[in-house]
From Swiss-Prot:
It comes from Brassica campestris. The keyword Secreted applies. GO terms for molecular function: pectinesterase activity; pectinesterase inhibitor activity. Pathway: Glycan metabolism; pectin degradation; 2-dehydro-3-deoxy-D-gluconate from pectin: step 1/5. Acts in the modification of cell walls via demethylesterification of cell wall pectin. This is Pectinesterase/pectinesterase inhibitor. It catalyses: [(1->4)-alpha-D-galacturonosyl methyl ester](n) + n H2O = [(1->4)-alpha-D-galacturonosyl](n) + n methanol + n H(+). GO terms for cellular component: extracellular region.
Amino acid sequence: LLVVGVAIGVVTFVNKGGGAGGDKTLNSHQKAVESLCASATDKGSCAKTLDPVKSDDPSKLIKAFMLATKDAVTKSTNFTASTEEGMGKNMNATSKAVLDYCKRVLMYALEDLETIVEEMGEDLQQSGSKMDQLKQWLTGVFNYQTDCIDDIEESELRKVMGEGIRHSKILSSNAIDIFHALTTAMSQMNVKVDDMKKGNLGETPAPDRDLLEDLDQKGLPKWHSDKDRKLMAQAGRPGAPADEGIGEGGGGGGKIKPTHVVAKDGSGQFKTISEAVKACPEKNPGRCIIYIKAGVYKEQVTIPKKVNNVFMFGDGATQTIITFDRSVGLSPGTTTSLSGTVQVESEGFMAKWIGFQNTAGPLGNQAVAFRVNGDRAVIFNCRFDGYQDTLYVNNGRQFYRNIVVSGTVDFINGKSATVIQNSLILCRKGSPGQTNHVTADGKQKGKAVKIGIVLHNCRIMADKELEADRLTVKSYLGRPWKPFATTAVIGTEIGDLIQPTGWNEWQGEKFHLTATYVEFNNRGPGANPAARVPWAKMAKSAAEVERFTVANWLTPANWIQEANVTVQLGL
Protein backbone atom coordinates (compact mmCIF):
# COMPACT_ATOMS: atom_id res chain seq x y z
CA LEU A 1 0.00 0.00 0.00
CA LEU A 2 1.08 3.55 -0.74
CA VAL A 3 0.31 6.24 1.81
CA VAL A 4 -1.21 9.23 0.06
CA GLY A 5 -2.12 12.23 2.14
CA VAL A 6 -0.83 15.17 4.07
CA ALA A 7 0.18 15.93 7.62
CA ILE A 8 -3.22 17.23 8.66
CA GLY A 9 -4.12 13.61 9.14
CA VAL A 10 -6.35 13.04 6.13
CA VAL A 11 -4.79 9.84 4.83
CA THR A 12 -6.15 7.62 2.12
CA PHE A 13 -4.67 4.24 1.41
CA VAL A 14 -4.42 3.43 -2.26
CA ASN A 15 -3.17 0.16 -3.66
CA LYS A 16 -0.98 -0.12 -6.71
CA GLY A 17 -4.00 -0.55 -8.91
CA GLY A 18 -5.48 2.71 -7.66
CA GLY A 19 -8.36 1.09 -5.77
CA ALA A 20 -9.31 2.29 -2.34
CA GLY A 21 -8.63 0.04 0.59
CA GLY A 22 -10.44 -0.05 3.90
CA ASP A 23 -14.13 0.01 4.66
CA LYS A 24 -16.24 2.81 3.18
CA THR A 25 -18.15 3.20 6.39
CA LEU A 26 -19.65 6.08 8.29
CA ASN A 27 -16.77 5.65 10.69
CA SER A 28 -14.24 6.41 7.95
CA HIS A 29 -16.23 9.52 7.03
CA GLN A 30 -16.21 10.69 10.63
CA LYS A 31 -12.49 10.11 10.92
CA ALA A 32 -11.83 12.02 7.70
CA VAL A 33 -13.96 14.96 8.87
CA GLU A 34 -12.33 14.92 12.28
CA SER A 35 -8.86 14.93 10.73
CA LEU A 36 -9.72 17.68 8.24
CA CYS A 37 -11.27 19.87 10.93
CA ALA A 38 -8.41 19.38 13.38
CA SER A 39 -6.73 22.52 12.05
CA ALA A 40 -9.89 24.67 12.05
CA THR A 41 -10.30 27.52 14.51
CA ASP A 42 -13.94 26.52 15.07
CA LYS A 43 -13.83 22.72 14.94
CA GLY A 44 -17.48 22.29 15.86
CA SER A 45 -18.69 24.48 13.00
CA CYS A 46 -16.30 22.74 10.60
CA ALA A 47 -17.58 19.27 11.52
CA LYS A 48 -21.21 20.40 11.33
CA THR A 49 -20.61 21.80 7.85
CA LEU A 50 -19.11 18.53 6.57
CA ASP A 51 -21.37 16.07 8.38
CA PRO A 52 -23.93 15.85 5.51
CA VAL A 53 -21.17 14.99 3.00
CA LYS A 54 -21.05 11.20 3.10
CA SER A 55 -17.55 10.75 1.81
CA ASP A 56 -14.06 10.24 3.17
CA ASP A 57 -12.41 11.68 0.04
CA PRO A 58 -10.48 14.83 1.07
CA SER A 59 -11.05 16.44 -2.34
CA LYS A 60 -14.82 16.05 -2.09
CA LEU A 61 -14.88 17.20 1.53
CA ILE A 62 -12.84 20.32 0.85
CA LYS A 63 -14.86 21.24 -2.22
CA ALA A 64 -18.05 20.74 -0.21
CA PHE A 65 -16.65 23.08 2.42
CA MET A 66 -15.94 25.73 -0.22
CA LEU A 67 -19.48 25.46 -1.57
CA ALA A 68 -20.88 25.76 1.96
CA THR A 69 -18.74 28.86 2.52
CA LYS A 70 -20.02 30.34 -0.72
CA ASP A 71 -23.60 29.67 0.38
CA ALA A 72 -22.92 31.35 3.74
CA VAL A 73 -21.44 34.45 2.06
CA THR A 74 -24.49 34.59 -0.23
CA LYS A 75 -26.70 34.64 2.86
CA SER A 76 -24.56 37.40 4.37
CA THR A 77 -24.99 39.42 1.18
CA ASN A 78 -28.75 38.94 1.29
CA PHE A 79 -28.78 39.83 5.00
CA THR A 80 -26.97 43.09 4.24
CA ALA A 81 -29.49 44.00 1.55
CA SER A 82 -32.45 43.22 3.81
CA THR A 83 -30.89 45.22 6.66
CA GLU A 84 -30.53 48.23 4.38
CA GLU A 85 -34.10 47.82 3.16
CA GLY A 86 -35.40 47.46 6.72
CA MET A 87 -33.76 50.68 7.87
CA GLY A 88 -35.59 52.60 5.14
CA LYS A 89 -35.95 56.31 5.74
CA ASN A 90 -34.34 56.03 9.18
CA MET A 91 -30.99 55.38 7.57
CA ASN A 92 -28.49 58.24 7.48
CA ALA A 93 -26.05 58.87 4.65
CA THR A 94 -23.13 57.16 6.38
CA SER A 95 -25.11 54.01 7.18
CA LYS A 96 -26.28 53.79 3.58
CA ALA A 97 -22.75 54.26 2.31
CA VAL A 98 -21.30 51.58 4.55
CA LEU A 99 -24.05 49.06 3.76
CA ASP A 100 -23.59 49.69 0.06
CA TYR A 101 -19.88 49.10 0.55
CA CYS A 102 -20.62 45.91 2.50
CA LYS A 103 -22.74 44.62 -0.38
CA ARG A 104 -19.94 45.41 -2.81
CA VAL A 105 -17.15 43.66 -0.89
CA LEU A 106 -19.35 40.66 -0.12
CA MET A 107 -19.92 40.34 -3.86
CA TYR A 108 -16.13 40.44 -4.27
CA ALA A 109 -15.92 37.58 -1.78
CA LEU A 110 -18.50 35.60 -3.74
CA GLU A 111 -16.64 36.15 -7.00
CA ASP A 112 -13.40 34.94 -5.45
CA LEU A 113 -15.10 31.88 -3.97
CA GLU A 114 -16.51 31.05 -7.40
CA THR A 115 -12.99 31.31 -8.81
CA ILE A 116 -11.63 29.07 -6.05
CA VAL A 117 -14.22 26.36 -6.70
CA GLU A 118 -13.59 26.58 -10.44
CA GLU A 119 -9.81 26.38 -10.03
CA MET A 120 -10.11 23.42 -7.66
CA GLY A 121 -12.04 21.42 -10.23
CA GLU A 122 -13.39 18.00 -9.34
CA ASP A 123 -10.14 16.66 -7.96
CA LEU A 124 -8.00 18.57 -5.48
CA GLN A 125 -5.08 16.40 -6.53
CA GLN A 126 -4.91 18.41 -9.76
CA SER A 127 -4.68 21.72 -7.86
CA GLY A 128 -1.34 21.21 -6.15
CA SER A 129 0.53 24.03 -7.85
CA LYS A 130 -2.37 26.43 -7.21
CA MET A 131 -2.74 25.85 -3.48
CA ASP A 132 -0.92 29.00 -2.37
CA GLN A 133 -2.95 31.14 -4.77
CA LEU A 134 -6.20 29.53 -3.62
CA LYS A 135 -5.25 30.30 -0.04
CA GLN A 136 -4.48 33.90 -1.03
CA TRP A 137 -7.96 34.31 -2.51
CA LEU A 138 -9.48 32.75 0.62
CA THR A 139 -7.63 35.27 2.76
CA GLY A 140 -9.23 37.98 0.63
CA VAL A 141 -12.67 36.44 1.17
CA PHE A 142 -12.14 36.71 4.93
CA ASN A 143 -10.72 40.23 4.67
CA TYR A 144 -13.65 41.51 2.61
CA GLN A 145 -16.05 40.52 5.39
CA THR A 146 -13.79 42.12 7.97
CA ASP A 147 -13.70 45.30 5.87
CA CYS A 148 -17.46 45.56 6.05
CA ILE A 149 -17.47 45.55 9.85
CA ASP A 150 -14.38 47.75 10.20
CA ASP A 151 -16.00 50.53 8.19
CA ILE A 152 -19.11 50.71 10.41
CA GLU A 153 -18.80 53.49 13.00
CA GLU A 154 -22.34 53.31 14.45
CA SER A 155 -22.25 50.80 17.32
CA GLU A 156 -25.74 49.31 16.96
CA LEU A 157 -25.42 48.76 13.21
CA ARG A 158 -21.96 47.31 13.76
CA LYS A 159 -23.42 44.82 16.23
CA VAL A 160 -26.30 43.84 13.92
CA MET A 161 -24.03 43.35 10.91
CA GLY A 162 -21.40 41.55 12.95
CA GLU A 163 -23.95 38.98 14.02
CA GLY A 164 -25.51 38.81 10.57
CA ILE A 165 -22.30 37.81 8.79
CA ARG A 166 -20.81 35.87 11.69
CA HIS A 167 -21.43 32.43 10.20
CA SER A 168 -19.83 33.21 6.85
CA LYS A 169 -16.79 34.67 8.62
CA ILE A 170 -16.41 31.50 10.69
CA LEU A 171 -16.59 29.30 7.60
CA SER A 172 -14.14 31.53 5.73
CA SER A 173 -11.77 31.39 8.68
CA ASN A 174 -12.02 27.61 8.86
CA ALA A 175 -11.43 27.32 5.11
CA ILE A 176 -8.19 29.29 5.45
CA ASP A 177 -7.10 27.01 8.30
CA ILE A 178 -7.72 23.91 6.19
CA PHE A 179 -5.80 25.26 3.21
CA HIS A 180 -3.00 26.40 5.48
CA ALA A 181 -2.70 22.88 6.87
CA LEU A 182 -2.58 21.50 3.33
CA THR A 183 0.06 23.92 2.06
CA THR A 184 2.15 23.54 5.22
CA ALA A 185 2.01 19.77 4.94
CA MET A 186 3.00 19.85 1.29
CA SER A 187 5.91 22.14 2.10
CA GLN A 188 7.11 19.90 4.93
CA MET A 189 6.83 16.79 2.81
CA ASN A 190 8.27 18.59 -0.24
CA VAL A 191 5.56 17.24 -2.40
CA LYS A 192 2.72 18.62 -4.48
CA VAL A 193 -0.77 17.26 -4.08
CA ASP A 194 -0.88 16.13 -7.68
CA ASP A 195 2.43 14.30 -7.19
CA MET A 196 1.04 12.41 -4.23
CA LYS A 197 -1.51 10.53 -6.26
CA LYS A 198 1.26 9.31 -8.56
CA GLY A 199 3.50 8.44 -5.66
CA ASN A 200 6.21 10.80 -6.87
CA LEU A 201 7.47 11.83 -3.47
CA GLY A 202 10.72 13.18 -4.94
CA GLU A 203 13.99 14.07 -3.29
CA THR A 204 14.62 16.56 -0.55
CA PRO A 205 15.40 19.95 -2.10
CA ALA A 206 17.35 22.92 -0.89
CA PRO A 207 15.30 24.78 1.78
CA ASP A 208 14.39 27.72 -0.44
CA ARG A 209 13.31 25.85 -3.57
CA ASP A 210 9.60 26.06 -2.87
CA LEU A 211 9.91 29.73 -1.97
CA LEU A 212 11.75 30.64 -5.16
CA GLU A 213 10.24 28.17 -7.61
CA ASP A 214 8.39 30.92 -9.47
CA LEU A 215 11.53 33.00 -10.11
CA ASP A 216 13.60 32.91 -13.26
CA GLN A 217 17.40 32.87 -13.49
CA LYS A 218 17.57 36.60 -12.79
CA GLY A 219 15.47 36.27 -9.67
CA LEU A 220 12.42 37.74 -11.38
CA PRO A 221 8.92 36.25 -11.21
CA LYS A 222 7.84 33.97 -14.02
CA TRP A 223 4.25 35.22 -13.74
CA HIS A 224 5.42 38.69 -14.72
CA SER A 225 5.75 38.69 -18.49
CA ASP A 226 8.65 40.16 -20.44
CA LYS A 227 6.20 42.70 -21.83
CA ASP A 228 5.26 43.87 -18.31
CA ARG A 229 8.90 44.17 -17.30
CA LYS A 230 9.63 46.33 -20.33
CA LEU A 231 6.61 48.49 -19.55
CA MET A 232 7.84 49.25 -16.05
CA ALA A 233 11.39 49.80 -17.22
CA GLN A 234 10.41 52.15 -20.04
CA ALA A 235 7.89 54.21 -18.06
CA GLY A 236 10.43 56.69 -16.81
CA ARG A 237 12.53 59.63 -17.83
CA PRO A 238 14.71 58.43 -20.71
CA GLY A 239 18.29 57.85 -19.62
CA ALA A 240 17.61 58.35 -15.92
CA PRO A 241 18.49 55.65 -13.39
CA ALA A 242 15.32 54.17 -11.97
CA ASP A 243 16.48 54.76 -8.39
CA GLU A 244 16.89 58.50 -9.05
CA GLY A 245 15.61 60.21 -5.92
CA ILE A 246 12.99 58.62 -3.73
CA GLY A 247 9.54 59.20 -5.08
CA GLU A 248 10.80 62.29 -6.86
CA GLY A 249 12.37 63.13 -10.20
CA GLY A 250 11.19 62.85 -13.75
CA GLY A 251 8.89 60.44 -15.43
CA GLY A 252 7.36 60.69 -18.82
CA GLY A 253 6.40 58.25 -21.43
CA GLY A 254 9.91 57.24 -22.41
CA LYS A 255 9.68 54.60 -25.11
CA ILE A 256 6.40 53.15 -23.93
CA LYS A 257 3.25 53.39 -26.04
CA PRO A 258 0.25 53.88 -23.74
CA THR A 259 -3.21 52.55 -24.40
CA HIS A 260 -4.75 55.79 -23.12
CA VAL A 261 -3.36 59.28 -22.52
CA VAL A 262 -4.81 61.66 -19.92
CA ALA A 263 -4.06 65.39 -20.11
CA LYS A 264 -5.80 68.33 -18.45
CA ASP A 265 -5.05 70.56 -21.45
CA GLY A 266 -6.93 68.30 -23.83
CA SER A 267 -3.84 67.00 -25.63
CA GLY A 268 -4.69 63.43 -24.66
CA GLN A 269 -7.67 61.18 -25.31
CA PHE A 270 -9.14 62.01 -21.90
CA LYS A 271 -9.13 64.94 -19.50
CA THR A 272 -9.80 62.84 -16.41
CA ILE A 273 -8.23 59.64 -15.12
CA SER A 274 -11.63 58.13 -14.34
CA GLU A 275 -12.62 58.39 -18.00
CA ALA A 276 -9.47 56.52 -19.01
CA VAL A 277 -10.15 53.77 -16.46
CA LYS A 278 -13.67 53.34 -17.85
CA ALA A 279 -12.14 52.77 -21.27
CA CYS A 280 -10.05 49.85 -19.98
CA PRO A 281 -11.46 46.39 -20.76
CA GLU A 282 -12.67 43.98 -18.08
CA LYS A 283 -10.86 40.70 -17.41
CA ASN A 284 -8.01 41.87 -19.57
CA PRO A 285 -5.30 39.25 -20.24
CA GLY A 286 -2.96 42.05 -21.31
CA ARG A 287 -2.26 45.52 -19.92
CA CYS A 288 -4.33 48.67 -19.98
CA ILE A 289 -1.61 51.34 -19.99
CA ILE A 290 -2.62 54.82 -18.87
CA TYR A 291 -0.14 57.68 -19.25
CA ILE A 292 -1.12 60.67 -17.11
CA LYS A 293 0.59 63.88 -18.21
CA ALA A 294 1.86 66.43 -15.71
CA GLY A 295 -0.87 68.26 -13.84
CA VAL A 296 -2.96 68.23 -10.68
CA TYR A 297 -6.03 66.02 -11.13
CA LYS A 298 -8.64 66.62 -8.46
CA GLU A 299 -10.82 63.53 -8.63
CA GLN A 300 -11.59 60.28 -6.88
CA VAL A 301 -10.49 57.34 -8.99
CA THR A 302 -11.72 53.77 -8.56
CA ILE A 303 -10.31 50.85 -10.51
CA PRO A 304 -13.16 48.28 -10.38
CA LYS A 305 -12.44 44.67 -9.48
CA LYS A 306 -13.10 43.38 -12.99
CA VAL A 307 -10.82 45.98 -14.60
CA ASN A 308 -7.57 44.15 -13.92
CA ASN A 309 -3.97 44.66 -15.07
CA VAL A 310 -4.05 48.45 -15.12
CA PHE A 311 -0.69 50.23 -15.34
CA MET A 312 -0.63 53.96 -14.62
CA PHE A 313 2.43 56.15 -15.01
CA GLY A 314 3.02 59.87 -14.95
CA ASP A 315 5.66 62.56 -15.41
CA GLY A 316 6.97 62.39 -11.85
CA ALA A 317 5.63 62.05 -8.32
CA THR A 318 5.62 65.84 -7.88
CA GLN A 319 4.47 66.56 -11.45
CA THR A 320 1.55 64.18 -11.97
CA ILE A 321 -0.62 64.42 -8.86
CA ILE A 322 -4.00 62.84 -8.13
CA THR A 323 -5.65 64.57 -5.20
CA PHE A 324 -8.96 64.71 -3.33
CA ASP A 325 -10.20 65.71 0.13
CA ARG A 326 -12.84 63.16 1.12
CA SER A 327 -12.69 62.09 4.78
CA VAL A 328 -14.69 60.37 7.51
CA GLY A 329 -14.61 63.45 9.73
CA LEU A 330 -15.61 66.12 7.22
CA SER A 331 -17.49 64.36 4.41
CA PRO A 332 -21.00 63.05 5.20
CA GLY A 333 -21.66 59.52 3.99
CA THR A 334 -17.99 58.54 3.98
CA THR A 335 -16.23 55.53 5.45
CA THR A 336 -12.50 54.88 5.70
CA SER A 337 -12.52 52.69 2.60
CA LEU A 338 -14.60 55.14 0.60
CA SER A 339 -12.41 58.12 1.50
CA GLY A 340 -9.55 56.97 -0.73
CA THR A 341 -8.42 59.35 -3.45
CA VAL A 342 -7.44 56.32 -5.54
CA GLN A 343 -9.10 52.97 -4.79
CA VAL A 344 -7.72 49.87 -6.47
CA GLU A 345 -10.12 46.93 -6.27
CA SER A 346 -8.54 44.80 -9.01
CA GLU A 347 -5.57 42.47 -9.35
CA GLY A 348 -2.32 43.23 -11.12
CA PHE A 349 -2.23 47.01 -10.63
CA MET A 350 1.04 48.84 -11.31
CA ALA A 351 1.97 52.51 -10.89
CA LYS A 352 5.09 54.60 -11.45
CA TRP A 353 5.98 58.30 -11.21
CA ILE A 354 2.67 59.50 -9.69
CA GLY A 355 1.79 61.46 -6.54
CA PHE A 356 -1.34 60.50 -4.55
CA GLN A 357 -2.80 62.93 -2.02
CA ASN A 358 -5.64 63.32 0.42
CA THR A 359 -5.82 66.95 1.50
CA ALA A 360 -8.60 66.66 4.11
CA GLY A 361 -6.08 67.59 6.81
CA PRO A 362 -5.73 66.35 10.40
CA LEU A 363 -9.32 67.31 11.30
CA GLY A 364 -10.66 64.95 8.66
CA ASN A 365 -9.74 61.88 10.73
CA GLN A 366 -9.55 58.85 8.42
CA ALA A 367 -8.66 60.19 4.98
CA VAL A 368 -6.98 57.73 2.64
CA ALA A 369 -4.79 58.82 -0.26
CA PHE A 370 -4.36 55.35 -1.78
CA ARG A 371 -6.16 52.09 -1.02
CA VAL A 372 -5.42 48.71 -2.58
CA ASN A 373 -7.77 45.73 -2.29
CA GLY A 374 -6.41 43.76 -5.24
CA ASP A 375 -3.67 41.16 -5.22
CA ARG A 376 -0.23 41.66 -6.83
CA ALA A 377 0.08 45.45 -6.67
CA VAL A 378 3.46 46.90 -7.62
CA ILE A 379 4.29 50.55 -7.00
CA PHE A 380 7.55 52.30 -7.88
CA ASN A 381 8.78 55.89 -7.53
CA CYS A 382 5.48 57.26 -6.26
CA ARG A 383 4.51 59.58 -3.42
CA PHE A 384 1.63 59.32 -0.93
CA ASP A 385 0.68 62.32 1.22
CA GLY A 386 -2.05 62.56 3.82
CA TYR A 387 -2.59 62.50 7.55
CA GLN A 388 -4.57 59.62 9.08
CA ASP A 389 -4.60 56.33 7.10
CA THR A 390 -2.66 57.74 4.14
CA LEU A 391 -1.62 54.41 2.61
CA TYR A 392 -4.27 51.71 3.09
CA VAL A 393 -2.58 48.44 2.06
CA ASN A 394 -5.79 46.59 2.61
CA ASN A 395 -5.61 43.20 0.92
CA GLY A 396 -3.53 40.84 -1.20
CA ARG A 397 0.21 41.05 -1.81
CA GLN A 398 1.78 44.46 -2.38
CA PHE A 399 5.29 45.65 -3.18
CA TYR A 400 6.48 49.27 -2.95
CA ARG A 401 9.92 50.57 -3.87
CA ASN A 402 11.39 54.10 -3.81
CA ILE A 403 8.27 55.77 -2.48
CA VAL A 404 7.63 58.65 -0.11
CA VAL A 405 4.73 58.26 2.30
CA SER A 406 3.74 60.90 4.85
CA GLY A 407 1.11 61.02 7.55
CA THR A 408 0.23 61.09 11.23
CA VAL A 409 -2.10 58.43 12.65
CA ASP A 410 -1.77 54.82 11.41
CA PHE A 411 -0.65 56.17 8.07
CA ILE A 412 0.49 52.80 6.72
CA ASN A 413 -2.25 50.35 7.62
CA GLY A 414 -4.21 47.39 6.33
CA LYS A 415 -4.60 43.63 6.16
CA SER A 416 -2.21 42.61 3.38
CA ALA A 417 1.22 41.09 2.91
CA THR A 418 3.16 44.25 2.09
CA VAL A 419 6.85 45.04 1.69
CA ILE A 420 8.00 48.66 1.43
CA GLN A 421 11.62 48.84 0.35
CA ASN A 422 14.15 51.68 0.01
CA SER A 423 11.60 54.36 0.84
CA LEU A 424 11.25 57.56 2.83
CA ILE A 425 8.62 57.59 5.57
CA LEU A 426 7.72 61.00 6.99
CA CYS A 427 5.80 61.74 10.18
CA ARG A 428 3.82 64.98 9.96
CA LYS A 429 2.48 67.46 12.49
CA GLY A 430 -1.17 66.74 13.18
CA SER A 431 -3.73 68.25 15.52
CA PRO A 432 -2.53 69.53 18.92
CA GLY A 433 -1.87 66.61 21.25
CA GLN A 434 -2.13 64.05 18.45
CA THR A 435 0.21 61.04 18.51
CA ASN A 436 1.84 59.68 15.36
CA HIS A 437 1.85 55.98 14.50
CA VAL A 438 3.67 54.94 11.35
CA THR A 439 1.97 51.54 11.02
CA ALA A 440 -1.23 49.82 12.14
CA ASP A 441 -1.48 46.27 10.89
CA GLY A 442 -4.88 44.58 10.89
CA LYS A 443 -4.10 40.86 10.95
CA GLN A 444 -7.03 39.09 12.64
CA LYS A 445 -5.99 35.47 12.22
CA GLY A 446 -2.92 33.77 13.61
CA LYS A 447 -0.32 31.70 11.77
CA ALA A 448 -2.71 30.52 9.06
CA VAL A 449 -2.36 33.70 7.01
CA LYS A 450 0.61 35.70 5.82
CA ILE A 451 -0.44 39.26 6.61
CA GLY A 452 1.76 42.06 7.85
CA ILE A 453 3.78 45.17 6.98
CA VAL A 454 7.52 44.99 6.33
CA LEU A 455 9.65 48.14 6.18
CA HIS A 456 13.00 47.19 4.66
CA ASN A 457 15.96 49.52 4.15
CA CYS A 458 13.83 52.64 4.66
CA ARG A 459 14.27 55.98 6.44
CA ILE A 460 11.77 57.13 9.10
CA MET A 461 12.05 60.86 9.68
CA ALA A 462 10.09 64.00 10.59
CA ASP A 463 8.88 66.19 7.77
CA LYS A 464 9.79 69.88 7.66
CA GLU A 465 6.73 71.07 9.62
CA LEU A 466 7.29 68.55 12.41
CA GLU A 467 11.08 68.94 12.57
CA ALA A 468 11.13 71.63 15.26
CA ASP A 469 8.62 69.77 17.45
CA ARG A 470 9.73 66.21 16.69
CA LEU A 471 10.93 65.58 20.26
CA THR A 472 7.71 66.80 21.90
CA VAL A 473 5.14 65.30 19.50
CA LYS A 474 5.09 61.59 20.28
CA SER A 475 5.76 59.32 17.31
CA TYR A 476 5.83 55.51 17.33
CA LEU A 477 6.77 52.84 14.80
CA GLY A 478 3.26 51.46 15.10
CA ARG A 479 0.45 49.96 17.13
CA PRO A 480 -1.65 46.79 16.75
CA TRP A 481 -4.97 47.44 15.03
CA LYS A 482 -6.04 43.80 15.36
CA PRO A 483 -5.13 40.85 17.66
CA PHE A 484 -2.39 39.33 15.50
CA ALA A 485 -0.90 42.51 14.04
CA THR A 486 2.48 41.81 12.43
CA THR A 487 5.12 44.38 11.52
CA ALA A 488 8.85 44.09 10.85
CA VAL A 489 11.32 46.95 10.56
CA ILE A 490 14.58 45.78 9.00
CA GLY A 491 17.78 47.58 8.00
CA THR A 492 16.07 50.93 8.45
CA GLU A 493 17.32 54.32 9.63
CA ILE A 494 15.09 55.51 12.47
CA GLY A 495 15.23 59.17 13.43
CA ASP A 496 15.16 60.54 16.96
CA LEU A 497 11.49 61.47 16.60
CA ILE A 498 10.52 57.87 17.44
CA GLN A 499 9.84 57.28 21.14
CA PRO A 500 12.44 55.13 22.94
CA THR A 501 9.76 52.50 23.59
CA GLY A 502 9.32 52.16 19.82
CA TRP A 503 5.79 50.77 19.79
CA ASN A 504 2.47 51.71 21.35
CA GLU A 505 -0.60 49.81 22.52
CA TRP A 506 -4.03 50.15 20.93
CA GLN A 507 -6.04 52.08 23.49
CA GLY A 508 -8.50 49.91 25.40
CA GLU A 509 -7.25 46.65 23.86
CA LYS A 510 -4.63 44.02 24.69
CA PHE A 511 -3.70 43.23 21.10
CA HIS A 512 -0.03 43.87 21.88
CA LEU A 513 0.04 40.63 23.87
CA THR A 514 -0.63 38.56 20.73
CA ALA A 515 0.91 40.84 18.10
CA THR A 516 4.28 40.29 16.40
CA TYR A 517 6.68 43.22 16.25
CA VAL A 518 10.23 42.61 15.07
CA GLU A 519 13.23 44.88 14.57
CA PHE A 520 16.56 43.89 13.05
CA ASN A 521 19.75 45.64 12.05
CA ASN A 522 18.30 49.14 12.25
CA ARG A 523 20.32 52.29 12.75
CA GLY A 524 19.92 55.89 13.86
CA PRO A 525 19.07 57.49 17.22
CA GLY A 526 15.55 56.07 17.20
CA ALA A 527 16.77 52.49 16.78
CA ASN A 528 18.25 52.06 20.26
CA PRO A 529 16.68 48.87 21.69
CA ALA A 530 17.46 49.64 25.34
CA ALA A 531 14.01 51.01 26.25
CA ARG A 532 11.86 49.09 23.76
CA VAL A 533 8.57 47.63 24.97
CA PRO A 534 9.03 44.03 26.19
CA TRP A 535 6.56 42.65 23.65
CA ALA A 536 8.65 43.79 20.67
CA LYS A 537 11.35 41.39 19.51
CA MET A 538 14.86 42.66 18.87
CA ALA A 539 16.14 40.00 16.48
CA LYS A 540 19.79 39.04 16.86
CA SER A 541 20.32 37.10 13.65
CA ALA A 542 19.25 37.19 10.02
CA ALA A 543 17.65 33.77 10.40
CA GLU A 544 15.08 35.26 12.78
CA VAL A 545 13.78 37.67 10.14
CA GLU A 546 14.34 35.64 6.98
CA ARG A 547 10.60 35.05 6.64
CA PHE A 548 10.08 38.79 6.14
CA THR A 549 12.22 39.08 3.02
CA VAL A 550 10.58 39.81 -0.32
CA ALA A 551 11.32 36.27 -1.53
CA ASN A 552 9.51 34.74 1.44
CA TRP A 553 6.84 37.26 2.42
CA LEU A 554 5.34 37.74 -1.04
CA THR A 555 5.12 34.12 -2.16
CA PRO A 556 4.23 32.22 -4.25
CA ALA A 557 5.09 34.55 -7.13
CA ASN A 558 7.46 36.72 -5.14
CA TRP A 559 6.78 39.56 -7.46
CA ILE A 560 10.11 41.05 -8.01
CA GLN A 561 9.92 43.50 -10.82
CA GLU A 562 12.80 44.40 -13.06
CA ALA A 563 11.67 47.94 -13.83
CA ASN A 564 15.20 49.32 -13.82
CA VAL A 565 15.19 49.09 -10.02
CA THR A 566 17.55 46.96 -7.97
CA VAL A 567 15.32 44.71 -5.87
CA GLN A 568 16.49 42.89 -2.78
CA LEU A 569 15.06 39.39 -2.59
CA GLY A 570 16.86 38.74 0.69
CA LEU A 571 18.11 40.88 3.55
